[in-house]
Amino acid sequence: AIVSLVKSDQICIGYHANNSTEQVDTIMEKNVTVTHAQDILEKTHNGKLCDLDGVKPLILRDCSVAGWLLGNPMCDEFINVPEWSYIVEKASPANDLCYPGDFNDYEELKHLLSGINHFDKIHIIPKSSWSNHEASSWVSSACPYQGKSSFFRNVVWLIKKNSSYPTIKRSYDNTNQEDLLVLWGIHHPNDAAEQTRFYQNPTTYIGVGTSTLNQRLVPKIATTSKVDGQSGRMEFFWTILKPNDAINFESNGNFIAPEYAYKIVKKGDSAIMKSELEYGNCNTKCQTPMGAINSSMPFHNIHPLTIGECPKYVKSNRLVLATGLRNSPQRERRRKKRGLFGAIAGFIEGGWQGMVDGWYGYHHSNEQGSGYAADKESTQKAIDGVTNKVNSIIDKMNTQFEAVGREFNNLERRIENLNKKMEDGFLDVWTYNAELLVLMENERTLDFHDSNVKNLYDKVRLQLRDNAKELGNGCFEFYHKCDNECMESVRNGTYDYPQYSEEARLKREEISGVKLESIGTYQILSIYSTVASSLALAIMVAGLSLWMCSNGSLQCRIC
């Protein structure tokens, strides 16, 4: 029988592929190439200090917070400052306490400033009101200004006048509606001679009282090493005076009195950031000591300290979410050898770069030609699902998260070390959670795409039933003619199985008959070949025996 081989119509289920080299990690695999991916780790910054939501930072340049608040004469540019979004202080500012000494509860004051956005400096005790004490001429070479000795602008160093230091009793009532930051100090002389030279009285004290504060200070007269030419020391203190409260001062010497105080006119999220950067005339929603971040990503690895609406800091170097499919384009040689097919679900070997308008779809071939068609419905559902998942992750993580530095004094080093260990532990947990989240979501996304391809395959299989043959590679070979209209009905789910079932049945029987005829022919040929081979072997054996008998090599006896 002569059998003519005619190529049958086919439809294949496949998925999109492209030239992407994006790679992601999953729970089970590393470096999986995918068609589309989204980086969720911000790694870049602009290297500048920027406005935060349109409000400028207070950049103290070479001044410290203490130098600014007390009025170091080298910090005159900050005598009156507008509203700020955050405060920038260098790690070791040159203009700190110009007169050597200490600022009591300095770290606590800085913490207080992290909730303030604006001060109004107001006069509370004018320098001219100290008529019984020397208040105007006492300066120090430790606080130079334009080559001359000077002193802090916002406090007054009171010295004896006419060999007398009368006891001071002075009050200030806070009649404002806002809290008031008040600063004062005490001078610790080098020796007893300096004590009487400045204050006349050998034994002195300073008393300070409010509704919440009861303080009594006495000078510590001791010889110390010279710093900036000074053997004496100054110690400064502060308090918050509530509205309708009063602060009372009493002293008979060594008193550094407040002249100005700071009215806290606006509270809000702020921070004191340690940075050496310059102002960049820019705007941002997130600032770090390294520079500003303008990103909608949920994580960053730039610096653990931030201010504003910032991504969460993690120690990771790479966090990439898969949004597309596994990317394994078919090789051209395979396409020529085995036809166009693809998918993911275990039996489909590669993606289609020719299908560009969807993630999943079909390739058909019939007498009218061949072509790709994306399955728009399943693709759109998949896009919506993946997009919603990515947006949900970003929304949950990309909330305002400020991580400002905390400062501790020398007596709190153990607390500081413990705090650092706790913060490092939190960062490790955040990093682990972020990396695990990405691995799990990538695994789910790729499984999601696998499932969608499998569902599309099953949709076609259930329609065609025995009207087509599964080829095992994502393709179906029709037992009937399937023109373009027929192909479209398969794709849109309206395939009419009964319409083609009779033609398909005849085709199946025809194929089965050809197989049976072929099997019978092969059996006859096999028997003929066996018999012929046996006869040929018998003739050869008989001929050999006669030849051996004729030359005496074999004796033949006939009985």
Curated annotation (Swiss-Prot):
Residues 1-523 are extracellular. It is a single-pass type I membrane protein. It is found in: Virion membrane; Host apical cell membrane. Residues 545-559 are cytoplasmic. Its main location: virion. GO terms for molecular function: host cell surface receptor binding. Major glycoprotein, comprises over 80% of the envelope proteins present in virus particle. This is Hemagglutinin. The gene is HA.
